[in-house]
Amino acid sequence: MITAAVGALKERGGSSRQAILKYIQANFKVQANPAA
């Protein structure tokens, strides 16, 4: 999931943790876990 998120975001300087989390929540069936 993480590699798919980083590949899809295509951010030049790397993807932030928040951006990866937002992408995963939007595109995969996962429960929102604020501790993650």
Swiss-Prot record:
Annotated GO MF terms: DNA binding
Domain H15 stretches: 1-36
Expressed in which tissues: Sperm.
Keyword annotations from UniProtKB, A to Z: Chromosome, DNA-binding, Nucleus
Keyword DNA-binding belongs to the record: yes
Subcellular location: Nucleus; Chromosome
UniProt cross-references to InterPro entries, sorted A to Z: Histone_H1/H5_H15, WH-like_DNA-bd_sf, WH_DNA-bd_sf
GO cellular component assignments: nucleosome; nucleus
GO biological process, one term: nucleosome assembly
Gene3D superfamilies, alphabetized: Winged helix-like DNA-binding domain superfamily/Winged helix DNA-binding domain
Family: Belongs to the histone H1/H5 family.
Record protein name field: Histone H1-like protein EM5
